[in-house]
Amino acid sequence: MFEEFIRQYFVQTGLGWAAAGAMLTVMFGGVGSALGIRVAASEAAGVLSEKPELFGKLLILMALPGTQGFYSFIGAIFIASRTGLMGGAVTVPPIVGVALLFVGIGQGIVEWRSAIYQGETSAAAINLVAKRPDEAGRAIIMPALVETYAVVALLAAILMTLWLTNSSLTVANPLAAGA
């Protein structure tokens, strides 16, 4: 029974590989976002204990590291929708499934690390707002710069998924050229 599962989803089709890639991107992005929010919220809690009136200004800075989890989810849904995971015909060959596994891992790692870095940058911005509340608008710019690379990873994952699942994609056999 297990052998049949492996054969159907990993050998005959690449659906299992693609599903693993989709889940890994969600896992990495979700863990990174949770850690990033923890860093920012911990810093904000200290500030709010003395200046509770800053809650509205600090809320955005606390929430910013959570966007990577959403970007990972979008990447996973995109993989799932292009491979037959969400219904329809399974059209992904094993080699494309493996490639999508690496797309998911790549996006997931960038989302994971950028969420943590964004949490650290948000914590620094929270300290700025604590000392100079009128600088809240400028303080948001610092963690938003880290966000740029999370968006780049999402766009790269979407483009790679589109290219890899293009039905007109043909794979050349380099061994046949020398024969």
For the regions a language model picked out, list residue spans one by one.
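Hydrophobic, small-residue-rich transmembrane alpha-helices and their short perimembrane loops
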Residues: 1-179
